[in-house]
Amino acid sequence: MNDIFENTETMKENEHPRFYTAESVMRGHPDKLCDLIADSVLDACLQHDPASRVACEVMATHGHIIVAGEITTSAKPDVFNIVRDTLRDVGYDPKAYQIDCYIHDQSPDIAGAVEPELAEGEDEDTLGAGDQGVMVGYACNETPEYLPMPVVAAQRLVTLLEISRMTGVIPDIGPDGKVQVTMEYNGDTPVRITTVIVSVQHKEDTDINKLADLLDEYVFPLAFDGMPADDAEIILNPSGKFVQGGPDADTGLTGRKLMVDTYGTFAPHGGGAFSGKDPTKVDRSGAYMARYIAKNIVATHLATRCQVTLAYAIGQAEPVMVDVNTFGTCDACEDDCLAAAVRKAYDLTPAGIIKQLNLTNPIYKYTAAGGHFGRKDFPWEKVDNMSDFISYIQ
């Protein structure tokens, strides 16, 4: 993808620089910790009962973890041990937290809307959407991940910080941290990374200058490989000391890092969080499907940028809206033609999405940190044969 920078000098003179910023956070960030616990509870349910209905919320604060929500399942998830195991895996002492659990069954009104006919033996295709909402999927050709470059850079930084901590390469790093990457664009072309902010928890006696040297040696070269970052300003722990972190420093909640989970400021967000929700909740499954469609449109070279927006009504299977926006980068047809092709080529019902993307597999705790998009091992990231789709636009 380095050729994306070749024509920077020849861009039109009237195109003014623009700046975009993307953020990512480590697993020990209090909000992400809550997402991770919620998705671990979801996985425990799906592992034993793929038809589980889960809406799990978590709050983490000083000395306390509270798990609450609506769960209907034949599984018997050990919520307390799930919380303890997650805390230990992230890097916190589970003995330091009192765990409270407030789980009850899904509302019968919601259950009746999602599965109105199943009790009478109807096919699973009658599954209605678990809620109303708007879901957005986005893709572009800036990186091999089909994501904006600063989004990928931020995700890489967090991943490398996690690896450096867990392997002991940089032993002074703590579980909590966040990064921010600002990039200059000329039109739609990324030109250079201008600013990188790294705020990372550390031990009391850590030499910050030595920590900066270790990041320069082990993290930044890999994080920015293939990216124009030579002149980037690196700002490490701008608040100064960062010894106390996680829930001891800030209260965390599920669903508080929506833009970190998706595309930063490059695409709008419908407002529905992902973590802790089973795939009948279109907040999650609809967003995954929208990303899958957008990525395949770009990967097939129908467009260089694509945004797919879906909207659902609770209890109804078919979306009430399908919109495609290629920002003028599709030469094959108009965007309304692409939207019509999406309706014809894909089953956009909750049951159809679940089947297409195999969403009853217990994989969700792996999505909770590092971004839900851009990693090839997730089924909504696969690039498929688009011949059927293309036939609908010809």
Model-flagged regions — what are they?
Residues T206-I297, H301:
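Glycine-rich anion/phosphate-binding loop at the beta-strand->alpha-helix junction
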Residues R27-L46, E142-T159, K277-H301:
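Alpha-helical support elements that line or immediately flank enzyme active sites
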Residues S52-C56, G177-M183, A232-L236, L302-A313:
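A short glycine-rich, hydrophobically flanked beta-strand micro-motif that places a catalytic Asp/Glu
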Residues A55-T73, I314-E318:
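Short, charge-patterned binding micro-sites
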Residues T61, R305, A311-Q394:
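Internal helix-turn-beta structural module
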Residues N2-A55:
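N-terminal, positively charged regions that mediate nucleic acid binding
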Residues T21, G63, N81, R88, ...:
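Glycine-rich, mobile lid/loop segments that gate access to catalytic sites or pores
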Residues E23-V25, H29-C34, G128-T143, V243-A267, ...:
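Conserved phosphate/anionic-ligand binding catalytic regions in large, soluble enzymes, centered on
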